[in-house]
From Swiss-Prot:
Source organism: Vibrio phage KVP40 (isolate Vibrio parahaemolyticus/Japan/Matsuzaki/1991) (KVP40)
Taxonomy of the source species: Viruses, Duplodnaviria, Heunggongvirae, Uroviricota, Caudoviricetes
Keywords assigned: Capsid protein, Late protein, Virion
GO cellular component: viral capsid
Function as written in the Swiss-Prot or TrEMBL entry: Capsid protein that self-associates to form pentons, building the capsid in association with hexamers of the major capsid protein and one dodecamer of the portal protein.
Quaternary structure annotation from Swiss-Prot or TrEMBL: Homopentamer. Interacts with the portal protein. Interacts with the major capsid protein that forms hexamers.
Coiled-coil stretches: none
Gene3D superfamilies to which the protein is assigned, alphabetical: 3.30.2320.40
Record family assignment: Belongs to the Tevenvirinae capsid vertex family.
Superkingdom assignment: Viruses
Protein name per the record: Capsid vertex protein
Keyword Chloroplast part of the UniProt annotation: no
Pfam families with a match to the protein in the record: Gp23
InterPro entries hit by this protein: CAPSP (IPR038999), Gp23/Gp24_T4-like (IPR010762)
Amino acid sequence: MTVSNSNGLPDIVTVQKRLYPLIFTEIVSEQPTKQPVATAYGFKAVPEADDGSGWTQFGFRLDRWYAQVESSKMKTEISLETLQDMQALGVSNSVIVDSLADQIADEINTSIIGALNSISTVGAALTLTGNTDFEKGQDLYTKVHLAASEIEKTTGCKGTYVVAGGKCFGYLTGCGVVQRVGESDVYKAWSGLYIVHDKYATSDYVTVGVKKDMGDYEISSLVFSPYQFDQANDGAIAYQYKGTDPKSFHPVYGVIARYALTVPPLEDNQTGAVEIDWSNLGALANSSKLSYTYAVTV
């Protein structure tokens, strides 16, 4: 735990080290940006007409899309004097660091899941069989793996993750064949499938999708573009800010994280530079073939 000597605040580097591993990077591609407008690029194979040569013809298209970088802000009402008193008493500031990082990560992850579910293709509802919760968990575990295989048939990319809301997360993680990843809300099945918890879901559902790592390139339904203001630190997407409480005139401290969420152009007629309004991804509902969402009857 480090503390800034200049203002008594938790060192922002410490906040970032706590923050970045909590973000659901298992379900999104990452293309960092240094600009206030995040631009992402993608290649797409395009079949061409048969020219009679006996060779299957394929071309490639480069797509470019962009979105405005937005901000997540989190402030603490704890005053500088309180922080200094905590230090004098030997109380660790890690409580504040963890709280700020956890809450910002939570807000970013909520945005990621909401955007992903908005653009995913809606599949047929699933009904679980079994007389016990354990049997239902086993049935759901089988069904999400079948859904992952179905994605491979249409895209060539096998599903790598499932986002689970409501009771579905408990069923999947309670079936005895998963292990938690670090301190995050992510588990990994023995099969390699990542299981991500949508803890704010108001219904039972699963979204199965692809995040495929191809070295320098990644394939997924959604692109997460963190704004890297500090190139000296990996994952430097957050910075401190200082304001003033209008009522007490006391200093107010907090952290701002800046990032963008974008999706690739999903229609063949979307060419050139396509602007994505990530605050209204519902306009692209039911359009991504790299992720499918299913309502679940438990």
